C-alpha cells in the first residue's frame, strides 16, 4: 500500500532502508487509522489558509525536487560535487513529515492540530518513530533538522537540500 501512495520509495536502492521507510509509514498510518484517501485529501500544512496542495502531493513533490536537485548538481559538477547519499536523501524526504500523522487529527471532517501535536511538532515525533525502526542517524538528522527546529544545527548536505525544497513548497502557498 505505501508503494502505491508513495512510489518514490522504490527509488531507494538499499532494500533494507526501503523496508524501514515503509515500516515507519505503516505504523504512522495505523496510529490514527489514516487511509491513503484521507492523506490524499488533507492539506500538507495547517500553518496557512486555503491550502490546495495535499499532504501526499507535498511529500511526493519535495522528494522529486530533492532527486532533481541532486541530478542537476551531479550534471553540473560531476566528480567535484559535494557527495550526496541519494538513498538517505530520498528516505529523509519521504519521512520528514511522517510525524504529521501524529501532529494532526480529523475533527468534523477537517484536519486539525491534535493534543499531541500541540506539544510535539512533527520533526520530534518523526525522529522518534524512525529511530524505533532503526533508520540510520543520517536519515534521522534530515527529519530532525528540516524545519525551524534545525536552524541552530549544522545541516548535512542532504538536509540542506531537503530543507530548501521543503520551504520552496511551503513558502509559495502560505
What do the PLM-derived regions correspond to, one by one?
Residues 1-109:
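Acidic/His-rich, divalent-metal-binding segments that scaffold phosphate/diphosphate chemistry
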Residues 27-28, 56, 125-129, 135:
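Generic detector of short, locally flexible boundary/turn motifs and exposed helical patches
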Residues 77-80, 89-90, 127-174:
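Histidine/acidic-rich helix-loop-helix segments that form or flank divalent-metal centers
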Residues 81-87, 118, 122, 135:
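Short, well-structured alpha-helical patches and their helix-loop capping segments
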Residues 110-132, 160:
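Divalent-cation-assisted or electrostatically stabilized phosphate/pyrophosphate-binding catalytic cores
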Amino acid at each position: 500500500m505505501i508503494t502505491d501512495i508513495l512510489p518514490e520509495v522504490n527509488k531507494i536502492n538499499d532494500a533494507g532502508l526501503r523496508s524501514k521507510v515503509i515500516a515507519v509509514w505503516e505504523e504512522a498510518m495505523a496510529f490514527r487509522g489514516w487511509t491513503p484517501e484521507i492523506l490524499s485529501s488533507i492539506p500538507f500544512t495547517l500553518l496557512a489558509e486555503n491550502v490546495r496542495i495535499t499532504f501526499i502531493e507535498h511529500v511526493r513533490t519535495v522528494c522529486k525536487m530533492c532527486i532533481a536537485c541532486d541530478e542537476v548538481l551531479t550534471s553540473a559538477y560531476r566528480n567535484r560535487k559535494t557527495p550526496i547519499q541519494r538513498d538517505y536523501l530520498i528516505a529523509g524526504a519521504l519521512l520528514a513529515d511522517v510525524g504529521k500523522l501524529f501532529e494532526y487529527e480529523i475533527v468534523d471532517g477537517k484536519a486539525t492540530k491534535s493534543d499531541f501535536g500541540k506539544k510535539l511538532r512533527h520533526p520530534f515525533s518523526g525522529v522518534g518513530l524512525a529511530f524505533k525502526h532503526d533508520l540510520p542517524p543520517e536519515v534521522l538528522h534530515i527529519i530532525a533538522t528540516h524545519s525551524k527546529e534545525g536552524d541552530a544545527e549544522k545541516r548535512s548536505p542532504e538536509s540542506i537540500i531537503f530543507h530548501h525544497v521543503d520551504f520552496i513548497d511551503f513558502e509559495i502557498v502560505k
